[in-house]
Amino acid sequence: MSNNTANSSTEVVQDMCPYPYVDLHSHLQFEDFDGDQESIIAEMKEKNVITINIGTTLETSVAGLDLALRYSDTCYATLGLHPVYADESGLDELEKFSDTLKKTVQDEKSRTHMVGIGECGMDFFRVKKDDSKEDGILETGDNVENAEVKHFPIQEKVFERQIQLAQEYNLPLMIHVRDSYQKTLSILSKYFNTGEVKYRGNAHFFVGSMEEAQAFLDLGFSISFTGVITFVPVYEELVRFVPLERMFAETDSPYVSPKPYRGKKNTPVHVIEIYKKIAEIKGVSLSVVRETLYKNACRYWLKGRNIDNFDSYSPVR
């Protein structure tokens, strides 16, 4: 059999695979998609893609949930406060956020599609590093001209409150961890014990070390990879390291388009390219990745979906 024939047969099998592609983390409610949402969601339905609209402020959280309720077969949502918005006004928003979350959980219709809390965490990306300090991170009181340093305690307070709310309502966390792996793990370790079986949430847009990945796994978190893995080869070893059963794919759209869409606005449909890359790196078929990641999503995030819908299907391995 020629290579062309073999590839053609594989593509037919892949097209027959019933498991939806799951984009675990997108921002389809952002204004970047104004005017395009309907056409993008139509393409998602055509290509069997579902996504979670991740909240970053109270406003985008509510908008993401509204979108999920309008397109309930395609979209879900989280409510969350992103650390980059955790300044003095963020403390006021935190109180309003807590009230909104409580009302959402109590509303029978909303709670079926509000599936987690986040994105929340710590973000040190815009902070100058200090090599003289053991952890390399500047803190409040350090002698540096950087306005964001003073917001670290607020970031931490907003993050910890969302962890507490996740525990109170038994919801998974969508963790934002940018240049802050050790600090984020330190905070999470105050609330979760290493080696516990219970699922706690997902470390989104993971680009840390294997040791940091293992630390998240040990605390009960999964790890998601973006389109970065399609054009930065150094992360292939990390993808090989993380078990498929503890992994997700995400677009973080409208940001960070994968190959071959670099330079264009990202959409949840492009998660297909991330799935293909994971299959290539793992050395398994695309259908195996689709099955495993969908079942991961149903177990941990999309609990209203029937995980057994496709049990009669046997994927090509």
Segments the model singles out, each with a brief description of its role:
Residues 1-317:
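Mid-domain alpha/beta scaffold segments of enzyme catalytic cores
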